[in-house]
Amino acid sequence: LLAGEVDALPIKGFDFGNSPWEIDQADLQDRELILRTTNGVVATLKAQDSKEVLVAGLVNAEATVNYLRQQNPPTVVLVASHPTGDEDVACAEYMRHLLGGEGVSYANARERTLNARAAKKFYDGTHPRLRPEDIEAAASSDGPGALIMRVRFDPIPCITAHPAPQD
């Protein structure tokens, strides 16, 4: 299956856009999904020399931070992959807050995500596959039980979802 977007718009001929709502409606059990995004994939590939790469958004930020606490790495680098998007910066700041540094609350990060410049096109109704539900999903949190998204690069870049470790 192919999923992806260019400047938030679904790619012609792909099975899905980068829509949490569309993906949530699909039966993906035992299916492989190839994802292409404007910024996230590029940022992930640039991090491939790191010891471990995790992908997070507000939906799995808390679970990802809990995983990082358990692993206790000497250094954590948070990358906001959208070059001008406040929603990615808000998520990184929220994760930094959860890690014990300066940052913002979940409520603040959620509000910034819902009101980000990039979110506006999901509310204006100009494209049938850009829905307000996608921004609501992106701004939601599944809490500590969310899936941890690990990236492996061998033999090819691949993100795999793992249950959050229990305390």
Enumerate the predicted regions with their spans.
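Short beta-strand segments
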Residues: 3, 35-37, 56, 79-81
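Glycine- and Gly-Pro-enriched alpha-helical subdomains that act as flexible
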Residues: 59, 63, 67-72, 84-103
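Long, charged alpha-helical interface segments
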Residues: 15-32, 36-38, 46-47, 51-52, ...
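Residue-level preference for the first positions of well-ordered beta-strands
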Residues: 32, 75-77
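Nuclease catalytic cores that cleave nucleic-acid phosphodiester bonds
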Residues: 25-26, 42-45, 54-69
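A short acidic, often aromatic-flanked loop/helix-cap motif at beta-alpha or helix-coil junctions
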Residues: 8-11, 61-63, 154-157
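Residues that scaffold, gate, or flank divalent-cation-dependent active/transport sites
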Residues: 1-29, 41, 66
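Glycine-rich phosphate-binding loop signature in dinucleotide/nucleotide-binding domains
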Residues: 28, 71-74
